[in-house]
């Protein structure tokens, strides 16, 4: 039988030794210290053997997506999240932790959950996070010579260097067509 999310969050928090948990929007979420990230996954491995996903968020000045900063001293950080589940009971829990942006690294959970392998590789490639102990942090998407981490908020988009956002609408003709008129038909009189 599936526990309700708030009971599940409280139970999992007790198992991993955390006092920070919630069940917002029907999802059990437990915060763990980054030093205990691997240990939390090892502890939950038997109870929650299904690894669903891992992701990272670049929190710059927002407290939450779209929220204005509460003060000028908002801590810039990366949040790492993973979702574990039990397919027999239907339970899912999201574990999350914060890591510093100046040296973004955290223990790899790929040795506990094989499914975390590619998720960690993607986060390493796109966000520049070092998953310590990962067996193969090679690129998945980008060429090996690519410089930078495209999902970081500090990553400069070339298209925005060439044409500032939001830019103007360029009306270009299709090949073998005349350029569309930019005159107002009412002014043509």
Name each model feature, range by range:
Residues 1-189:
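Terminal low-complexity/charged segments
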């Amino acid at each position: 039988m599936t526990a309700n999310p708030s009971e599940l969050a409280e139970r999992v928090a007790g198992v991993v030794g955390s006092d920070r948990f919630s069940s917002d929007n029907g999802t059990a979420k437990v915060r763990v210290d980054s030093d205990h990230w691997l240990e939390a996954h090892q502890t939950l491995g038997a109870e929650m053997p299904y690894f669903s996903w891992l992701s990272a968020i670049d929190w710059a000045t927002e407290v939450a997506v779209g929220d204005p900063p509460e003060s000028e001293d908002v801590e810039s950080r990366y949040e790492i999240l993973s979702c574990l589940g039990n397919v027999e009971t239907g339970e899912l829990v999201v574990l999350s932790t914060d890591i510093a942006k100046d040296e973004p690294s955290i223990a790899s959970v790929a040795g506990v959950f094989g499914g975390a392998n590619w998720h960690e590789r993607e986060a390493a490639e796109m966000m520049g996070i070092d998953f310590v102990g990962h067996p193969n942090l090679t690129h998945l998407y980008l060429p090996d010579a690519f410089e930078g981490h495209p999902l970081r908020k500090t990553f400069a988009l070339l298209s925005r260097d060439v044409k500032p956002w939001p830019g103007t609408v360029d009306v270009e003709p299709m090949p073998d067509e005349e350029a569309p008129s930019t005159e107002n038909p009412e002014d043509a009189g």
